[in-house]
Amino acid sequence: MLASQARPFGRCGQNDLQPVERFLMIRLQKTEWAFLGLILVYSFIPAFGGLIRVLELAGGPQIAPVNARALLAPTPIILHILSSFLFCIVGAVQFLPSIRWHHPTAHRIIGRVIVVAGCVSALSGLWMTHFYVFSEALQGPALYWVRIILGAAMIGLIVWAVVAIGTRDILQHSTSMLRAYAIGQGASTQAVIGIAWIITVGSEALGPLRDGLMIFAWVLNLLVAEILIRSLLRPAKRLRSSAL
């Protein structure tokens, strides 16, 4: 082998690394770490509280209050918790510019996981909404139908995002996934609003008031998503078009 063709011992180019090794070498900006930290804090109660429930259903110690629905039919709630955790926590990585622009392979691999997780989260949520028995204090007709509509919409948005990326429509792919993510993060906003209500009023909201607060959380998430789409994604699309 010629000296010019030889590679130094113990070193290799980035192309020689396996996909997992390349993913571990990804370096994020400080603002991206801050964004991930914010998502972790924002999602803490529903995401990690849900994982505690999974451990309980798997035979672990009882920490959270007993949930009769989970004991009678644990599979849907376990699927919902695990898939929602992946979709909300790991899905946040997909919005990082360092991943999207500089590591497209990692973006695609994570994206496939997120697509499956999002669909499982929505489908299991639909199953629980329809088949679990809720008292009027926990779910009235309005909340029932909003959950059904948004669960179906989340699946439709994820499927549309997959179709869009297949046709190289990046804008449609990004907007659809952002809207689906806003729906999937509903539980986090609901937890924040619920805690704020308890601190302000001194008691938990129940009945139609609780339904209204939970619906408002989804409206707020989708409103933020639309603001981000119009302020960040669409201007970038116009800039690319004007450069052609």
Where are these regions (language model features)?
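Alpha-helical membrane insertion/targeting regions
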Residues: 12, 18-244
